């Protein structure tokens, strides 16, 4: 049984898994595709826009600008960049504040995320077997995969 189950091995799923692993949790990361981060390779026209140093509530035009203020205060761009730097990713900031990997390719972002995950023995990675059901009982989540396997 894992402390944390993460559904989806995209950028957010890998970041969530790494955050839990960094905090000492055992993690099961489940990705329906055969490989992690496939969609990441197309972000930012293949360059992978990591964050924007000029992001702020004044640039947010949704119905709840207070959410943007709260979210940015919880995890500012500088923290995102520092986190990627701990994994060895070098970045470049454009004049408009958009931040990309120095290589200008999303592959380098995916490579550092995958390498960071691979360092943890407390990670169980399941790919190519989509989740068909999630149940919660007595404080335990059980994910049933299309293959019939159950993960807790």
Language-model features and meaning:
Residues 12, 35, 46:
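Conserved Rossmann-like nucleotide-cofactor binding loop
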